[in-house]
Amino acid sequence: MWASFPRPEAIPPGYVGETQHQHRSIMLLNGKSRSWIFLYERLPAPSHDRVKCIAEDVIEFADSFADWSIWNNTKLEDVVDHSTAGMSNLEEGIVKNFSHGRIVLVGDACHKFTSNAGLGLNNGIQDIVAGCNSIRKVVTESGFDLPDVKALEATFKTYYEMRLGPFNDDFIHSKMMTRMQAWANTWYFLFTRYLFFIFSEWILFRFTMLRRVCTGLVLTMHLAKSRLVALLNGFIRSGYHSFIWISAIRPCNDQLLNQLLAGAIQIEILCSLNTWRISSCRAPLLLVFDQARG
């Protein structure tokens, strides 16, 4: 179960709190003005059934944690707001197929992590970056033609192989974090109570997480910042040619922008000169230079 509420004055902003017990735990996150709380309980057995929770389920589950302390003398019943709460079963697992034809999956659609370690969101972002970089590469290599399904399938296979190792590792870390916070067995209890602080301080934060952040993927493309570029790009894709417009050219004024969009624009590719030419245009001539070539 999750819920949001105004941050209590007794809890400083930016602090994170955990309340742990056998098979149950609470995680508290605090922002500047609001706080978020997550209540976890271990199911008697793993389940593949879809569960739809109603408002009465949320209230009943929250009431079972009502006297739990979430921060010093602050208890759950003092802060929880049922009107902003929701509830569902946590799902975890990795699908076998990440793509089919021209369709590719990212984030929770292909790998679900428990939320305790916050690794699901971060892996989803890395999936998108890896996918965008892979698609950009195959589109660039295709020249002025659209990549066919066979080329996309090879690209998505590369994307899968690139991401398989990182999210397999994070899946294990996320799984362990959930079970440690709920004391799933004696080993998890001992490790969480007596060893985890040393482990998290000296190994997890200083080495594992730092290395992962430093080796994270970044986009290899330029993002168009001009409204003109975005509109022209969509116009040209539906017309004569399809290409990635990487030169963000900002129009001088709205009048010029309207003239360009109203004009009958036809773009011809001069392959021999590797430049763009705009013809049949009633608007003023627009010269576009390739930033990568200066």
From Swiss-Prot:
Annotated metabolic or biological route of this protein: Mycotoxin biosynthesis
GO molecular function: FAD binding; monooxygenase activity
EC number(s) per entry: 1.-.-.-
InterPro entries on file: FAD-bd (IPR002938), FAD/NAD-bd_sf (IPR036188), FAD_mOase_fung (IPR050562)
Transmembrane segments: none
Keywords: FAD, Flavoprotein, Monooxygenase, Oxidoreductase
Residue sites binding FAD per the record: D108
Cofactor(s) the record lists: FAD
Secretion signal span: none
Miscellaneous section: Trichothecenes are sesquiterpenoid toxins that act by inhibiting protein biosynthesis.
Family as reported in the entry's similarity comment: Belongs to the paxM FAD-dependent monooxygenase family.
Purpose: FAD-dependent monooxygenase; part of the satratoxin SC1 cluster involved in the biosynthesis of satratoxins, trichothecene mycotoxins that are associated with human food poisonings. Satratoxins are suggested to be made by products of multiple gene clusters (SC1, SC2 and SC3) that encode 21 proteins in all, including polyketide synthases, acetyltransferases, and other enzymes expected to modify the trichothecene skeleton. SC1 encodes 10 proteins, SAT1 to SAT10.
The protein, known as: FAD-dependent monooxygenase SAT1
Organism annotation: Stachybotrys chartarum (strain CBS 109288 / IBT 7711)
Lineage: Eukaryota, Fungi, Dikarya, Ascomycota, Pezizomycotina
